Amino acid sequence: MAGRSELVVSFGEMLIDFVPTVAGVSLAEAPAFVKAPGGAPANVAIAVARLGGGAAFVGKLGDDEFGRMLAAILRDNGVDDGGVVFDAGARTALAFVTLRADGEREFMFYRNPSADMLLTHAELNVELIKRAAVFHYGSISLIAEPCRSAHLRAMEIAKEAGALLSYDPNLREALWPSREEARTKILSIWDHADIVKVSEVELEFLTGIDSVEDDVVMKLWRPTMKLLLVTLGDQGCKYYARDFRGAVPSYKVQQVDTTGAGDAFVGALLRRIVQDPSSLQDQKKLEEAIKFANACGAITATKKGAIPSLPTEVEVLKLMESA
């Protein structure tokens, strides 16, 4: 990757989250909702840009008020939106999200089909994708055609151009026809990624085993990988590289809303990796990068909403120094 740019290109969905004005209620009980920009790949792109890195987003939005608003949010946050296209015949996706009293998030999606699902491979900004040092994606874009084929083609283009491929499945069971199809399609591209990040919930979903022990995690390891990460919420993160493995504790903060914390973690880690790709082979450097990512995720959880909560590098370093 010597001589390549430090650009992180995110591929996938960007949508509007509608979040209740009060916490701890079901969607049916919510008295009112506020709108917030969302979508994990877009959050990652903005996280990278907020930290001073080069970031771009590739995806499709509805040619509507919400779609134009989301594209403007990307630009306002320093993300290159040259990979964004608009669909005049489909709406921007909506999601109603609530944090129930038991702490679990509840989702209800409006996508039948939404614009993000209708991206075709002919609409890909190939030149932008070829400039990526890291090409990052989730699994929601694998659910339906034509977006699935566009996703697979974009991965090929990025890989052929020398990019690292980064995969965060970002499981949303409610969007898949069945658990079986979700598992099969999420794993269908597993072998292509250089960097994979899963949560402990996703680890259990993909392995069928409720454990974060090394032997369980290693069921998801592939010889083609450079780094496999399991995030454990406020317990930090476990990491597995080709020649070493370990765990990095998180930072203790007062959590308000964990939405976007995982995306902040991914964005921060990718930012550090493109700054110094040798950290994938150097345990000390990698642990420093993960500490930085943990701090970024922790700060994001202290405020409401994903994008407004994403920190700057100064804020992250301040937390790391005070810990």
Curated annotation (Swiss-Prot):
Regarding activators and inhibitors, the annotation says:
Not inhibited at high fructose concentration.
User: Is Coiled coil tagged as a keyword?
Assistant: no
EC class (word): transferase
| A GO cellular component entry from the record | cytosol
- PROSITE patterns attached to this UniProt entry: PFKB_KINASES_1, PFKB_KINASES_2
Q: In which pathway does it act?
A: Glycan biosynthesis; starch biosynthesis
* Alphabetical UniProt keywords: ATP-binding, Carbohydrate metabolism, Kinase, Nucleotide-binding, Transferase
Q: Superkingdom of this entry's organism? A: Eukaryota
- As recorded in UniProt, its EC number(s) are 2.7.1.4
Q: Where are the annotated coiled coils located?
A: none
Expressed in which tissues: Expressed in roots, endosperms and leaves.
Q: Quote the catalytic activity from the record.
A: D-fructose + ATP = D-fructose 6-phosphate + ADP + H(+)
Instruction: Name its GO BP terms in alphabetical order.
Output: fructose metabolic process; starch biosynthetic process
What Gene Ontology molecular function terms does this protein carry?
ATP binding; fructokinase activity
The record's family statement is: Belongs to the carbohydrate kinase PfkB family.
Q: Which PANTHER family match?
A: FRUCTOKINASE-4-RELATED (PTHR43085:SF24), HEXOKINASE FAMILY MEMBER (PTHR43085)
Q: What does this protein do?
A: May play an important role in maintaining the flux of carbon towards starch formation. May also be involved in a sugar-sensing pathway.
Protein name, as recorded: Fructokinase-1
Organism from which the protein derives = Oryza sativa subsp. indica (Rice)
Gene encoding this chain?
FRK1
